[in-house]
Amino acid sequence: MFVLSGYEYLLGFFIICSLVPALALSASKLLRPSGYAPERRTTYESGMEPIGGAWIQFNIRYYMFALVFVVFDVETVFLYPWAVAFHRLGLLAFIEALVFIAILVVALVYAWRKGALEWS
């Protein structure tokens, strides 16, 4: 008997997962237009020609707002399954969710007091 008798489907899955992107990339390379017009090399931004250079420094406040957004977006990802299964999980899961929310509220208050949420 073959040693890997239960893994043929897994091997086939990995082969298909490797071939599909390779075939898609090859097909797009074969079917794309070959000529390049000078307009194709220009920067396109919302239908308007950009003014100034592309290498400008952004304010660090954008980073802070994005970081706070990601934290609370991840919170939503964790709390949604908990809310769906709330009735089946019991009291311990409720207390764990309260601790999780409390930690995030403490982090939000800390960021607020440090001025991370103020623009000026």
Curated annotation (Swiss-Prot):
EC number: 7.1.1.-
Localization (cell): Cellular thylakoid membrane
Pfam families in the record: Oxidored_q4 (PF00507)
Lineage: superkingdom: Bacteria
A Gene Ontology term for the protein's cellular component: NADH dehydrogenase complex
The keyword DNA repair is annotated on this UniProt entry: no
Keyword Manganese among record annotations: no
Main location: membrane
Keyword terms of this UniProt record: Membrane, NAD, NADP, Plastoquinone, Quinone, Thylakoid, Translocase, Transmembrane, Transmembrane helix, Transport
Protein name stated in the entry: NAD(P)H-quinone oxidoreductase subunit 3
Species assigned in the record: Nostoc punctiforme (strain ATCC 29133 / PCC 73102)
Gene responsible for this protein: ndhC
